[in-house]
Structure formats: structure tokens, C-alpha cells
């Protein structure tokens, strides 16, 4: 059953988001991101005195049609130093902002390591990183390590014939 959840911001503004009992906090953050343009990773939601954890359902948190959640937007204006480990096991430090895309980081890596962007891909904690996603969506922390993987190059077609 769908119902409207009231989301209140620190400045006093509020808005409604259509939700269901089985929806998770992560899904709610994605809907809020679509509605107000603040990326999910920058959102902190609270109900009464508890910070809402991403994997939990709204019903398990006791939220219902008359509930209001508080939205706090985390500032991401400070750069973050991360490591990118290449295929030889060497790591380089990169200054990034969580609001930048993976593609932006790939451009930096490409320039420093002299490897074309289409010849490698990046992963963090075993998860492939998509070019158009924001770095903040991956939960990067200061001094964390992103892995650079070389793409396999194709052969010449009918050489075995």
C-alpha cells in the first residue's frame, strides 16, 4: 500500500514522497534525489532521534502515513585523497570530490598513467565503477584504494581457421 511520507529539511521546507511499507531507506533516498536533486550519498535521514540505516525497510523502522523524517544534507565541498592501484601493484594518490563522476577520475588516471580511458576500468571493494555514477555513491573514504583493471584486448578474428 502506497502512502505519503513527509520529509522536512533543516531550513524548514518540507515535501511529500510517495512510499510503500516494504521500501528501504536506500530506495527512499533515491526518490528524494529525483525530487530535489541531492545525491543519495549526501543525504542523512532521521526519525525522532534515530538515524535511518540504508538497508532497513520503512515499516521495520515504525514509519507510517503520519510520520515525518528529517533530511540533513552532508556537505561535500572538501577534496578527498584516495589511492588508485594499477595492474603492477603501484598506487598513486588522487584528489577527488565525491560529487565528481567516475569518468572524471578515469580521465585523471589516464593522463597520469598514459593509458587511454577505454583500455581500463575501475572497481572499489569488488564492485565495478560505472562512468556516469558519482564517486560518492561508492562510499569512498579518505585514503581508500580504488583498483584499476586493464581491459582484455580482442584478437584478429579467423586466425585459427
Curated annotation (Swiss-Prot):
GO BP term (any one): positive regulation of interferon-beta production
Motif LRLRGG covers 150-155
Q: Which residues get modified to S-nitrosocysteine?
A: 76, 144
Which Gene Ontology molecular function entries are recorded, alphabetically?
Answer: integrin binding; protein tag activity
Q: Which residues lie in the propeptide?
A: 156-161
Matches recorded under PROSITE patterns? UBIQUITIN_2
Keywords on this record? Antiviral defense, Cytoplasm, Disulfide bond, Isopeptide bond, Repeat, S-nitrosylation, Secreted, Ubl conjugation pathway
Query: What SMART domains does its record include?
Result: UBQ
What inducers act on this gene?
Answer: By type I interferons.
What is one cellular component GO term in this UniProt entry? cytoplasm
Q: How is it modified after translation?
A: S-nitrosylation decreases its dimerization, thereby increasing the availability as well as the solubility of monomeric ISG15 for its conjugation to cellular proteins. Induced as an inactive, precursor protein that is cleaved by specific proteases to expose the C-terminal diglycine (LRLRGG) motif. This motif is essential not only for its conjugation to substrates but also for its recognition by the relevant processing proteases.
The entry's localization annotation reads: Cytoplasm; Secreted
Q: Where is the Ubiquitin-like domain?
A: 2-76, 77-155
Tell me the InterPro entries matching this sequence.
Ubiquilin, Ubiquitin-like_dom, Ubiquitin-like_domsf
Which residues bear the site annotation Interacts with activating enzyme?
151
Region listing for Involved in the ligation of specific target proteins, in residue ranges:
151-155
Q: Where is the cross-link described as Glycyl lysine isopeptide (Gly-Lys) (interchain with K-? in acceptor proteins)?
A: 155
Where does the UniProt entry say this protein principally localizes?
cytoplasm
| Subunit structure, as described in the record | Homodimer; disulfide-linked. Interacts with, and is conjugated to its targets by the UBE1L (E1 enzyme) and UBE2E2 (E2 enzyme). Interacts with NEDD4. Interacts with PARP12; this interaction inhibits PINK1/Parkin-dependent mitophagy.
Q: What does this protein do?
A: Ubiquitin-like protein which plays a key role in the innate immune response to viral infection either via its conjugation to a target protein (ISGylation) or via its action as a free or unconjugated protein. ISGylation involves a cascade of enzymatic reactions involving E1, E2, and E3 enzymes which catalyze the conjugation of ISG15 to a lysine residue in the target protein. Its target proteins include SERPINA3G/SPI2A, JAK1, MAPK3/ERK1, PLCG1, TRIM25, STAT5A, MAPK1/ERK2 and globin.
Domain remark in the UniProt entry = Both the Ubiquitin-like 1 and Ubiquitin-like 2 domains are required for its efficient conjugation to cellular proteins. The two domains play different roles in the ISGylation pathway: Ubiquitin-like 2 domain is necessary for the first two steps allowing the linking of ISG15 to the E1 and E2 enzymes while Ubiquitin-like 1 domain is essential for the final, E3-mediated transfer of ISG15, from the E2 to the Lys of the target protein.
Q: What is this protein called?
A: Ubiquitin-like protein ISG15
Q: Which species is the source of this protein?
A: Mus musculus (Mouse)
The taxonomic lineage of its organism, from the top, reads: Eukaryota, Metazoa, Chordata, Craniata, Vertebrata
Amino acid at each position: 500500500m502506497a502512502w505519503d511520507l513527509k520529509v522536512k529539511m533543516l531550513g524548514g521546507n518540507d515535501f511529500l514522497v510517495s512510499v510503500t511499507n516494504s521500501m528501504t531507506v536506500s530506495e527512499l533516498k533515491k526518490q528524494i534525489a529525483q525530487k530535489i536533486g541531492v545525491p543519495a550519498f549526501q543525504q542523512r535521514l532521521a526519525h525522532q532521534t534515530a538515524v535511518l540505516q540504508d538497508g532497513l525497510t520503512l515499516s521495520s523502522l515504525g514509519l507510517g502515513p503520519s510520520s515525518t523524517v528529517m533530511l540533513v544534507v552532508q556537505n561535500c565541498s572538501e577534496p578527498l585523497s584516495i589511492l588508485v592501484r594499477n595492474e603492477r601493484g603501484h598506487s598513486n594518490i588522487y584528489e577527488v570530490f565525491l560529487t565528481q563522476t567516475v569518468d572524471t577520475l578515469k580521465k585523471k588516471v589516464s593522463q597520469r598513467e598514459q593509458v587511454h580511458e577505454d583500455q581500463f576500468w575501475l572497481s572499489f571493494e569488488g564492485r565495478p565503477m560505472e562512468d556516469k555514477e558519482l564517486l560518492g555513491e561508492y562510499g569512498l573514504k579518505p585514503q581508500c584504494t580504488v583498483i584499476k583493471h586493464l581491459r582484455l584486448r580482442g584478437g584478429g578474428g579467423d586466425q585459427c581457421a
